[in-house]
């Protein structure tokens, strides 16, 4: 998932920085880094992991945490 993909997901979900960070279980700062594509502390490009991409896909599909998902 590229930062542009992440931004598109963020926009499609109508998340704010706070609601998106809470949904993914990360800090607001980490979420902001993913949206910008750069680390706010080093300025270096960041990589959004496959795990995060899969979590985004699950949330977009209306799925919650496994323990609360119908399975």
Q: Residue locations for each model-derived region?
A:
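Recognition helix of helix-turn-helix/homeodomain-like DNA-binding domains
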Residues: 25-46
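Short alpha-helical "recognition helix" segments of helix-turn-helix
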Residues: 19-24
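A short, Lys/Arg-rich alpha-helix, primarily the initiator
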Residues: 1-14
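DNA major-groove recognition helix of helix-turn-helix/homeodomain DNA-binding modules
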Residues: 44-67
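Intrinsically disordered, low-complexity regions enriched in Ser/Pro/Gly/Gln/His and often acidic
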Residues: 1-2, 26-27, 59
